[in-house]
Amino acid sequence: MLKNPSVKYRAFAPVPLSDRQWPSKTITKPPIWMSTDLRDGNQALFEPMNAERKLRMFEMLVKIGFKEIEAGFPSASDTDFGFIRKLVEEGRVPDDVHIEVLTQARPELIARTMESLKGAKNAIVHVYNATAPNFREVVFQQGKQGVKAIATESARQIKEIAATQPETNWTFQYSPEVFSGTELDFAKEVVDAVTEIWEAGPERKVVINLPATVEMATPNIYADQIEWMHRNLERRDGIILSVHPHNDRGTAVAAAELAIMAGADRVEGCLFGNGERTGNVDLVTLALNLYSQGIDPGLDFAQINEIARTAEYCTQLPIHPRHPYVGDLVFTAFSGSHQDAIKKGLAAYKAGDIWQVPYLPLDPKDLGRTYESIIRVNSQSGKGGVSYLLEAEYDLRLPRRLQVEFSSAVQRVTDDTGKEVRAADIWRIFEEEYLTRAEPIEYLSHSLYDESGKQGVKIRIRRFGKEEELSGSGNGPIDAAMDALKLGVELRHYEEHSIGSGTDAKAVAFMEVADPEHPGDLFGVGIDANIITASFKAMLSAANRAAARRPKSEWARLCGGAE
């Protein structure tokens, strides 16, 4: 690093806005939310989503409550074009959802983009071109008027093509890319020219999106830029003012919140902050920040674990255990004083009261999470944690969420006995909790076979004391076994690893499932010399543990068969 960074880097100039109003404003309602997980988020992945993952992400976004979803960049990719056609032609876009597509400001790309939306009921066509000096001068070698002409010619072309597709309810959107690095008077000049062509008005609103394509300054600077545009743009009553913050400086959430205070009506971003470089603004954090202040965000995150696991599956990116609201450790206290304060706060809280539990900004139950994982041991009074001892003594590496779950079982034992637990005690607790449960279902044996290109399985079990042989098929052994057993749980996550090495090696399988009738996911564990057998044992372990939370009268409904 340089001793004097000022010789290489320049401080961002403040905005001349001496009478700024945003510092005295408060947020009282949610913005319009636009998810760009399928476009900006997808293009930033090591391996972009395939059609199956894209569709799963789209359906989840709809379920959460997004009414505007940017589904792709159809002129840049045949895959994106085909996916958008699939959504339109198969009627997968609900009537109250606007599908959005992005295009560069080039005639042939605009034409291809508009073609992708033929037959759509509600569509947003989003065109952009870079307006910042370094892009004008270095990348495009254009003057201001040349850049402005690109924007206006594109706006005119979009308007003309839209008139030939009257079956679609169109919304036009323009972004001066790298707005945060563009001179404000020039950004206004370009935007005003575009909104004039589109005849923006109260009955014909357009979206003007002001992106921090690269986050260049502190959030207050971005707020000043947004307020300046909010106060100076022509045809403001015909504009939905949108922001698209990136997280290069780590303050995208704050920038978005201050931008809303400064006059923004709409926010574009991704679940859990996915996106180019350091990511887009995290819409989950933004929404739950509002929720924790008593404002309904209009998005449903009541099953945050399911949403997180689906996002991880679709993006193939892990969510950090410290991620706000959703990370595996955010509702977990390791400090003894924190544990004591939380216990007392939970004991004092009564349903209907204002939430004031120390260290917990909102009630985990509101997100479908449970209190059991909040208080946990972490280091056996400084002599090594539960998970450390299991790994050190038994070569068992528990997934993070299972560490949280199992530590509660250990805590119950230490609370009951008041004694220190050693590695052998922890292993005994683990066996009893996960490995030796045989009610109501016990694994006996299985065989695999091919069935019309799918995996078939015959699995022998003892259920409610009676031996049975069941058959099923699926995309793999686990899917086939789930088909055969007809268990009333949903698979959330699966992982495995080996224990030991050489001829004595075994496999351990961890299966995380959800019981639709009980909040909070739970794990099953199986250990065997054969990995498939270990997987089946883990499946039944999870089902038996789910059954243990229910009265016996409900076991048949959960585990199939008849008592």
Swiss-Prot record:
InterPro entries on file: 2-isopropylmalate_synth_dimer, AIPM/Hcit_synth_CS, Aldolase_TIM, IPM_Synthase, LeuA-like_post-cat, LeuA_allosteric_dom_sf, LeuA_N_DRE-TIM, PYR_CT
Catalytic activity from the UniProt record: 3-methyl-2-oxobutanoate + acetyl-CoA + H2O = (2S)-2-isopropylmalate + CoA + H(+)
Annotated EC: 2.3.3.13
Positions annotated to bind Mg(2+): D40, H244, H246, N280
Biological processes, Gene Ontology terms: L-leucine biosynthetic process
Annotated Pfam families: HMGL-like (PF00682), IPMS_D2 (PF22615), LeuA_dimer (PF08502)
Chief location: cytoplasm
Region (Regulatory domain): 437-563
SMART domains: LeuA_dimer (SM00917)
Cited Gene3D superfamilies: 3.30.160.270, Aldolase class I (3.20.20.70)
MF GO annotations: 2-isopropylmalate synthase activity; acetyl-CoA C-acetyltransferase activity; magnesium ion binding
One GO cellular component, as annotated: cytoplasm
Pathway: Amino-acid biosynthesis; L-leucine biosynthesis; L-leucine from 3-methyl-2-oxobutanoate: step 1/4
Annotated Pyruvate carboxyltransferase domain residues: 31-305
Function recorded in the entry: Catalyzes the condensation of the acetyl group of acetyl-CoA with 3-methyl-2-oxobutanoate (2-ketoisovalerate) to form 3-carboxy-3-hydroxy-4-methylpentanoate (2-isopropylmalate).
Family label: Belongs to the alpha-IPM synthase/homocitrate synthase family. LeuA type 2 subfamily.
Assembly and binders: Homodimer.
Listed HAMAP family: LeuA_type2 (MF_00572)
Protein name (record): 2-isopropylmalate synthase
Species this chain originates from: Parvibaculum lavamentivorans (strain DS-1 / DSM 13023 / NCIMB 13966)
Gene for this chain: leuA
